[in-house]
Design a protein with these regions (language model features):
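Short, small-residue-biased leader/transition segments that mark boundaries at the very start
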Residues: 2-9
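Conserved alpha/beta-hydrolase fold motif
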Residues: 22-23, 45
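Gly/Ala-rich beta-loop-alpha elbow adjacent to hydrolase catalytic centers
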Residues: 23-32
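Active-site signature of alpha/beta-hydrolase-fold catalytic machinery across serine-
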Residues: 34-38
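A conserved short beta-strand
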Residues: 40-56
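The feature captures the conserved acid-bearing segment of alpha/beta-hydrolase catalytic domains
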Residues: 52-127, 132
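Histidine-bearing beta->alpha loop at or near hydrolase active sites
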Residues: 137-147
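Catalytic active-site module of serine/aspartate enzymes centered on a nucleophile-bearing elbow/loop
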Residues: 147-172
């Protein structure tokens, strides 16, 4: 398995700053899973609409076809995946993500990513982990785009994140 310069950089960053919480967004979600697997300094992950997920070998869900291409989980050795079960993980998804197949490219793209995210959370928890997926509209937080951190209500989302950090002892 290739370990490129980006992987080395992330591991070195956590070695330099010490233990911390990793916040990822979109395609960076995949890099976050790999960073946590390879960096014991990662104490938890907050992932905003991650784009790709890892699963233990032999447990990768079926591919999910969509208008924007096929969503595929990525297999990692079980011992690597199990490192994700040792830290709290929370995923956030905003509005405008349909439950059913649609002809809208953006909605379809995130529909399959949300569905795969649910399977990722199930896999982490099935292996003894602590993962949560929050669909913001379902908890009354509305109006969010894919860029949750820059939307007008980002302070409300930050408050939710802060509460999660406290609940998991990650605010110290």
């Amino acid at each position: 398995r290739s370990r490129g310069l980006g992987d080395v950089y992330k591991r070195q960053l956590f070695k330099r700053v010490g233990k911390g919480i990793l916040v990822t967004h979109s395609a960076g979600g995949f890099l976050g899973w790999l960073t946590a697997i390879r960096s014991p300094e990662v104490r938890g992950i907050i992932s905003l609409e991650p784009g790709t997920y890892v699963f233990p070998e032999g447990e990768v869900p079926e591919d999910m076809p969509s208008l924007t291409g096929t969503m595929k989980g990525i297999a990692v050795p079980p011992e690597e995946f199990n490192k994700l079960t040792q830290i709290p993980i929370i995923l956030y998804f905003g509005d405008y993500i349909p439950e059913n197949v649609t002809d809208k490219l953006g909605g379809e793209n995130w529909r399959v990513r949300l569905q795969m995210g649910r399977k990722f959370v199930e896999a982490v928890n099935r292996h003894g982990g602590n993962a949560v997926l929050v669909e913001l509209p379902k908890i009354g937080i509305r109006g969010n785009t894919h860029f949750l951190m820059s939307d007008k209500n980002n302070n409300i989302i930050a408050g939710h994140m802060a509460a999660w950090l406290r609940q998991n002892g990650l605010d110290r």
